[in-house]
């Protein structure tokens, strides 16, 4: 019992550390993007939805369902352009080549080369090309994308070592420009390039009392126009088992240590250099039927000139088996200081022209939920969480000739409810549903600009005699409020209508190594808007062949 008293004291100290007043997190760089008078081939990244599909559980699984944490620094995930290519429901045993063509003069080419199964090495190379040419002269919504990726990994009795590298280039346009602005029309083109590299080592050991670690070094160079961001990060999770004592069992003591150095440069402006140090200790154990994880989320921030700014938040998660092997309830406390970056801004809304690099502080997040499993066919999760966020980013339209976006930050309280359900009819059919419901309360802003209050996704997959694989996706989003204008006393507002998007396709494997695919997006041909003044492409479809070798 005395150990429980010590642990309680430890958590009380963590709560008192959290009680420190949040510090000034503002580090704003506002930039009005300039462009050379050239019109390049374009890529519209987000205007059709890529649906984050619920993953129906495979039949006869035996794992326990782990609840998925809900991020609130960006309440709505970015919706990139529709995957005109559709990932097959079966796994390729080795390498493949995929080619296709669509109704918007859409060529698709993809290949994936890898070695056969090997217990010592794995390596591979992948390339993807996708382009549209819809001749929508009034929208300039077409895009071009190239993506190449390579990897190498080796396995031994001491651990796994791996290298990865990728390069992705997206060309797209501003196309929400004002029709009367001929200057804007000549400066629509934007190009995003992103190079990423990773080296990692995961140690392994058959001895339960030996300390292990998972260490990774990550680098990326991200560029859009004249704005360039470089990021160097290394993190290591060190962990080991702790001998049982008294009523505490299955103890694991761990700590994740991270170093992140980010540079940002635009035109002739002075470079912005930032350092983020993280230290997250954890103690995981089982007490009676409770599984407990307790510790701290610690971030120390340096921006090159100010003194170090520490941010410390407690972390607690407790799970309880309500009905053994059927239902589990969980709850806890979380929170963290988070980096805002050029990469995350553009990946969320690539029509942004003012880059506000104000960091985000999730002061506290309270969460509770229940997971359930019914036999080997169905599983579900329900979660409610409340977050208090400093400097939550909101996208608003500027009044420039492109109708581009900028970011304003505000204090936010967010209540979110998530429900997800998956059901499998043996291997013949699988269906998944996820829904998110939000309630926002901002300190200064009257509306959650460009954020929905409801979003839902449905995914269905079928397997007909291991030859025909139809699939169906539906994505829906509630209406949103939109603001145009930087002045807090003089701006206009609009309503973006609620919308839904239906996608469907079929994969037909008429030979063991040769299959036909057809994918159709936005079947209802609704020119809805995810971002104000940027209507999505209409109905689009692509079909082709996949050859496995």
Where are these regions (language model features)?
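Outer-membrane beta-barrel transmembrane domain signature of Gram-negative proteins
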Residues: 189-200, 216-288
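Exposed, low-structure sequence patches enriched in small/polar residues
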Residues: 92, 97-100, 128, 291-295, ...
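Surface-exposed extracellular loop regions of Gram-negative outer-membrane beta-barrel proteins
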Residues: 114-134, 249-262, 272-303, 426-437
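Outer-membrane beta-barrel translocator/receptor signature
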Residues: 77-81, 88-97, 101-148, 159
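Short loop/turn motifs that connect adjacent beta-strands in outer-membrane beta-barrel proteins
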Residues: 85-92, 117-120, 155-160, 204-211, ...
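Membrane-embedded beta-strands of outer-membrane beta-barrel proteins
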Residues: 111, 148-150, 197-201, 232-240, ...
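N-terminal periplasmic/intermembrane-space "pro-region" immediately following the signal or transit peptide
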Residues: 18-87
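Flexible loop and strand-edge segments within Gram-negative outer membrane beta-barrel domains
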Residues: 132-149, 164-212, 216-231
């Amino acid at each position: 019992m005395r150990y429980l008293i010590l642990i309680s004291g430890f958590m009380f100290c963590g709560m008192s550390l959290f009680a420190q007043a949040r510090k000034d997190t503002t580090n704003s760089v506002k930039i009005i993007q300039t462009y050379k008078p050239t019109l390049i081939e374009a890529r519209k990244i987000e205007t059709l939805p890529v649906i984050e599909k619920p993953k129906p559980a495979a039949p006869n699984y035996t794992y326990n369902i782990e609840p998925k944490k809900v991020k609130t620094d960006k309440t709505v995930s970015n919706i990139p352009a529709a995957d005109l290519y559709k990932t097959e429901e079966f796994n390729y045993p080795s390498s493949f080549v995929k080619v296709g063509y669509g109704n918007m003069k859409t060529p698709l080419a993809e290949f994936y080369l890898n070695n056969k199964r090997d217990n010592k090495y794995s390596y591979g190379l992948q390339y993807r090309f996708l382009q549209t040419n819809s001749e929508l002269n009034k929208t300039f919504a077409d895009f071009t994308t190239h993506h190449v990726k390579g990897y190498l990994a080796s396995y031994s009795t001491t651990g796994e070592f791996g290298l990865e590298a990728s390069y992705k280039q997206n060309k797209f346009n501003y196309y929400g420009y004002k029709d009367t602005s001929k200057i804007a029309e000549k400066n629509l083109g934007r190009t995003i390039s992103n190079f990423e590299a990773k080296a990692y080592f995961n140690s392994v050991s058959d001895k339960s009392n030996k300390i292990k670690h998972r260490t990774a070094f990550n680098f990326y160079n991200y560029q859009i126009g004249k704005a360039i961001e470089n990021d160097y990060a290394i993190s290591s999770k060190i962990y080991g088992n702790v001998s049982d004592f008294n009523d505490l069992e299955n103890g694991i003591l761990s700590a994740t240590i991270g170093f992140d150095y980010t540079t940002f440069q635009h035109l002739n402006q002075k470079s912005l250099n930032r350092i983020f140090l993280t230290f997250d200790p954890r103690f995981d154990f089982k007490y009676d039927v409770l599984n407990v994880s307790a510790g701290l989320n610690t971030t120390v921030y340096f921006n090159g000139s100010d003194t170090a700014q520490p941010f410390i938040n407690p972390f607690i998660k407790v799970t309880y088996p309500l009905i053994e092997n059927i239902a589990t309830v969980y709850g806890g406390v979380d929170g963290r200081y988070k980096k805002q970056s050029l990469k995350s801004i553009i990946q969320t809304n690539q029509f942004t022209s003012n880059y506000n690099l104000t960091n985000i502080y999730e002061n506290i997040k309270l969460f509770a939920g229940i997971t359930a499993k019914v036999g080997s066919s169905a599983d579900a999760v329900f979660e409610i969480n409340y977050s208090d966020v400093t400097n939550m980013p909101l996208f608003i339209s500027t009044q420039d000739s492109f109708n581009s976006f900028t970011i304003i930050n505000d204090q936010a309280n967010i209540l979110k409810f998530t429900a997800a359900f998956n059901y499998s009819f043996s291997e013949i059919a699988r269906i998944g549903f996820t829904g998110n419901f939000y309630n926002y309360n901002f300190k200064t802003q009257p509306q959650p600009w460009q954020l929905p209050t409801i979003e839902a996704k449905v995914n269905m997959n079928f397997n007909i005699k291991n030859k025909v694989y139809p699939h169906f996706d539906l994505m829906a989003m509630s209406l949103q409020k939109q603001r145009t204008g930087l002045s807090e006393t003089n701006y206009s507002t609009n309503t973006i209508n609620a919308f839904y998007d239906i996608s469907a396709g079929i994969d037909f494997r008429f030979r063991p190594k040769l299959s036909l695919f057809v994918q159709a997006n936005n079947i209802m041909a609704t020119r809805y808007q995810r971002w104000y003044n940027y209507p999505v492409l209409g109905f689009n479809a692509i079909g082709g062949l996949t050859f496995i070798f």
